[in-house]
Each structure stands twice: as structure tokens, then as C-alpha cells.
Amino acid sequence: MKKIFLLAFLLLSTLSANSKKAGEFTVLQWNIWQEGTSVPGGYDAIINEIVRLKPDFVTFSEVRNYNKSNFSARVLSSLREKGLAYYSFYSYDTGLLSKHPITDSLTVFPENGDHGSIYRLLATVNGHKVAVYTAHLDYLDCAYYNVRGYDGSTWKEIPKPQTVEEVLKVNTDSQRDDAIKLFIDQAHKDMANGYSIILGGDFNEPSHRDWLETNKDMYDHNGMVIPWTVTTLLEEAGFIDSYREIYPDPLTHPGFTYPSDNLLIAPEKLTWAPKADERERIDFIFYQGKGLQAEKAIIFGPKSSIVRSQRVKETTKDKFLLPKGVWPTDHKGLLVTFRFTE
């Protein structure tokens, strides 16, 4: 009788573990720096890391389709040669990869004048409808550089702003808030149709959760506590910052994704503010959906960053998934594991 009970218990435990695994999927946000062309061997490194990590979804930033090519199709072909089947569609500036068949795709914010873009796919993951968005938001009027004494459009040295209002005025001169408002509108439509939402992207703007009273005198924040626009809009609309949900303290887990160190590139080519500490968490994965939960999050890339034109190893409690070979970009990526709990 005891043996039967033990066998039943083990069987139930196994089924429970398997059901948890069945509900899990991973999302990789990755700015690939001009399709990896800025780093020798960069494209092959992108493919090799996807083969290693096998994420369910990849949200790319800086897709360029050089010489009238189709980057997404090229990636699918390269992965197929290595025995992996992924799905995608033509896009520019941002891109999407999916392990799961894509049932629909949409341009939410088309690229125009290099002010960023947002695309969306629909897919089903283990019976759950998922809408995955990729965003590369406007890099101009990049106001966190103004705080550090650099113009956020020309990157020339300027006097530092004295008020938060000055900073936010520059910030909203960009098209980042316009793009994210369109995302929110479309995402609400998708949710009304039963979809859970994932948004991965390089926002080119920090989080209001990272510029607090506790760190206002760190990282060249210039004593400022700033309610950055894009993440505030997302949070007000019910979207959850996966990294900050898991690691709520920016002192212990700042989660910097830019500028990443890259040993194949000289430090002066990795910085836009050579005299400043410009480290920021600008690559995000936000989400919202019934029964959807972020389980794990890890920074993907080198453990060192660029600070005042120097390579500096991070000493925070952030967890890193180090690259196996060539690092193809000047950003760090973000890999998040999600699970459906119902």
C-alpha cells in the first residue's frame, strides 16, 4: 500500500512538474547593433546565440535590411541550416522571431525618418493566445543624456538642465511617447480578444523605477528624480516591467543594458557621452495578461560596461548570462522566462 501511495505521489509530482514546464516560454529582447555588422563575426554570433538559447520569441532592435535584403528571412534560413524552425515576417528597424506559427502580423508604428518602430505578431503558446510586440523607440531627444551634460540629439556637450521639467520637455519632444500610446491602444484591442501581451524593446529612455530618491546622486543622475514618460504610461495602462517586478531595488539590481562593453570594439566607439557615467537600463520586457507571470529574468551579455570611456566590470547583484563567443552588439540583452499559471 505504501509503495502504491509513493508511486502515485511521484506520478503526481511528475505531472505537476511537467505541467509547469508546459506553461513556460522565454522571450529575448536584443538590440543587435545594425544586424551585427558593427562587430567582426557579429551576424554569426547572433545566430549561434539563438541556437544556444532557443528562445520562444526574440524581439530585435536595429534591423536594417541592408542592400535591399530581408534580414528576417536570412535569419530563418541560417537557423534552418542548424536544424531550428522559426517563423518571422518582413520588417524594418525592429524584428520578431517566433518558435510558434504566426497567425497574424501588424505594423503598429511604422519607421519614418529613423524615429523608431513597433511591430506585433499573434501566436499560440500551449493553448494560450499571445501577442508579442517589438519596439525600437526614437533615439533622438534622448533626454537622459541632457541630464549628463550632453545634447540628446547631437551629443555635443551642453550645460546640465536644472529642473525635471526641462528634462521632460526634451523627452516628450521625441516620438517615443507617441509610439507607446499607439502600442497601448492596439494592445488593449488584443487583450479584448483574449490575448496576453508581451512587449520587448530598446526604449532609448530609462524607467521611472530607476531614477529614485535613493540613487539620485549616483550614475550622474545630477540629483534628479525623474518620472520618465514611456514606462510611466505603460505602468498606468497596467503593464508590468518584468525585470523590476523580479528585482525591485535599482540599488542592488540596476540592470544596466547600455552601453555594454565589447572587447572587439574600442571603448571610445561604445560611448555617446565620453566624460559621463551614461549607464542605463533601456532594454525592457513588459507584459500583461490573465494568468501570465514573469518567473525569471537575466541580463544577457558581458558583465562589464563603459563608464567615462573606460571598461568597468559590474559589481551589483544582477545576474548575467555570458555570451559563449563573440558579442555582436553594444547593448546587453534581456532574457525573461514566463509561465501561465492558469
Could you tell me what each predicted segment is?
Residues Q34-G41, T59-F60, D141-Y144, H208, ...:
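Short, solvent-exposed loop/turn elements at domain surfaces
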Residues F25-I32, I46-S69, V132-A135, E166-T214, ...:
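Active-site beta-strand/loop signature of hydrolases that rely on acidic residues for catalysis
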